[in-house]
């Protein structure tokens, strides 16, 4: 009985520690076999891409002249990394649904680690819901990078917790954002730009769409809009 009780106490302490740290790299005992992390160390970096001369849905009046703007998108990118003595682990400071409350997520990626250049690696684009942010599937991003993928999660402008605008912008821009990010990363890959340039195999790309992200994906796969 004492052994059983002692094991229960240790298990409870472990759960409490993980909860306090908001760890995103914990694999539950009941998780399927493929949920385990892969063999690669993980790096993470943040980049911005800008879609120039994009229709500004929010500021275009009904029946009026179309407004345009430069649409900036922030990407969180996880990738296989070549660690040189760094200890795995990073902290993500995340805005929540209440913009006044920040959450701290703890993972195993290393910020701006040296890329492992034995690729190229297939690309996965992650598209969040409305509203949301690029960190909502950070656990998936880290996990896939450990298995040999480059994972790019988008902060969709006017669709994040701290930048939420009318849903009309999201309906119009979501599939366009996904396509623009793919094309931008393909260009980075083709020109071997920056440390990630030679890592990305943009010809082998998948998209993970959560909620409104799935809507954008369906449209990009050929699902059209109705006239209404």
Residue positions per predicted region:
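Conserved hydrolase catalytic core segment
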Residues: 220-228
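Gly/Ala-rich beta-loop-alpha elbow adjacent to hydrolase catalytic centers
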Residues: 209-213, 217
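Domain-level recognition of soluble alpha/beta enzyme cores
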Residues: 21-124, 146
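Alpha/beta-hydrolase active-site loop
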Residues: 136, 167-203, 218-219
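Positively charged n-region of N-terminal signal peptides that target proteins for export
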Residues: 1-4
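Divalent metal-coordination and catalytic microenvironments
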Residues: 77, 144, 178, 205
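N-terminal signal peptide c-region/cleavage motif recognized by signal peptidases
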Residues: 14-16
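Short substrate-entry loop that stabilizes the transition state in hydrolases
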Residues: 108, 112-163
